[in-house]
């Protein structure tokens, strides 16, 4: 299996922002799922585990990883 092309490494500030947003419950369902994907990817979860835990698709996980790496947190959400 090839190495991951898009590795999510959140800064402490980004992680705190995502935790605050997900904890407050003030995000749309779509943004909540994106935030959860980023948090789990940052914790080195495998894509298959993220997919199972969040009931999402591989393409969604890959797309969110790519958006974060190429455009940052705002672009990924």
Language-model region placement:
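Short, basic alpha-helical/linker "hinge" immediately adjacent to a nucleic-acid-recognition surface
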Residues: 1-77
């Amino acid at each position: 299996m090839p190495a991951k092309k898009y590795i999510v490494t959140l800064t402490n500030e980004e992680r705190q922002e995502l935790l605050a947003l997900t904890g407050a419950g003030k995000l749309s369902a779509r943004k909540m799922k994106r935030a959860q994907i980023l948090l789990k990817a940052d914790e080195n979860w495998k894509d298959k585990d993220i997919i199972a835990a969040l009931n999402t698709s591989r393409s969604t996980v890959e797309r969110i990883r790519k958006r974060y790496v190429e455009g940052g947190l705002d672009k990924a959400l």
